[in-house]
Amino acid sequence: MGVEPDESYCIGTDKEFPDLVIEVVVTSGGINRLAIYQQLGIQEVWFWSEDRLAIYHLRQNLDQFTANFGYEAINRSQVLPELNIELLTESIQNPSPLAAAKAFREGIL
């Protein structure tokens, strides 16, 4: 791919490039990597940084979103529209992985 995201997912069928990539920003990377993902046609990029999830979706009209390399910052995933982002964020922030998984499962049922 030219860049290695922390996680990547193809939704529905396998493809050459994933539909969704997730980056955990610790010291470097971040929004500037959108330029690379845009060239690859990655539909959605999530950045986890400082206990916050930022979601960017690639738009057809790249000129309208030049500041973010053709991506629009959005509050709800368009690749996974049924996903409750608030529940996901709360679960990620839970210090107990077991309790986090349980709370997330209960929240989606």
Each model region followed by its residue ranges:
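C-terminal interaction segment
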Residues: 1-40, 46-109
